[in-house]
Amino acid sequence: MAGLTLERIAVGALKDIHLDVAPGEIVCLSGPSGSGKSRLLRAVSDLEPHGGTARLGGVEQGAVAGHRWRRSVMMVPAESAWWFDSVGEHLHKPMPEALEALGFSDETASWSVSRLSSGEKQRLALVRTLSREPRALLLDEPTANLDETTTRRLEDWLLPLIRKRRLPVLWVAHGGEQIRRLAGRHFRIEGARLVEEPVRT
């Protein structure tokens, strides 16, 4: 698998962002509300105009059509969109093991999206994304609506998958404990730049 490289990314207040994320590495991002965490992920996924570029292995973001780039470098926003009536219609392929690991039943694929809670949508948005076999993940506070037990359950499912598929991951997180559990490296947004913080103290 390929690593993810950010080269001179500029979006909003952020300027000249350089970052290399190795295959299978989780890099956590944190910072105050409004500092640009989500906008940075949107720039990397080519969902927002920006300066600079991103690379996945030897492929440059601007060298392929946006929809093709986003199939490889997939972003899971904090509030996911749903466009079909049922959960199963959103899955690229059946994901029974993932559903079970996250506490869902076999019938979940037939559930109406309208019955889902915010926490269920967050978990199922991750299942939906992984069903499409991306080559890199951009996660915007994917456990924000989950309690501690459910958060740990999601991490226990997702981290081995990241390692197995060797996915480079940018993960926006606020909680210090979660960052210590997940991150290979941690960067905090301060003004226009990323400042590396110690992961474990």
Model-derived regions: residue spans:
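H-loop/switch region of ABC-family ATPase nucleotide-binding domains
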Residues: V172-H174
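Conserved ABC ATPase signature
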Residues: S112-L116, E120
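Hydrophobic anchor residue at the start of the ABC signature
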Residues: L126
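Q-loop/switch helix immediately C-terminal to the Walker
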Residues: S72, E79-A98
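ABC ATPase NBD coupling module
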Residues: E60-M74
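Catalytic Walker B motif of ABC-type/P-loop ATPase nucleotide-binding domains
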Residues: L137-E141
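Helix-to-loop junction immediately C-terminal to a conserved catalytic motif
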Residues: S45
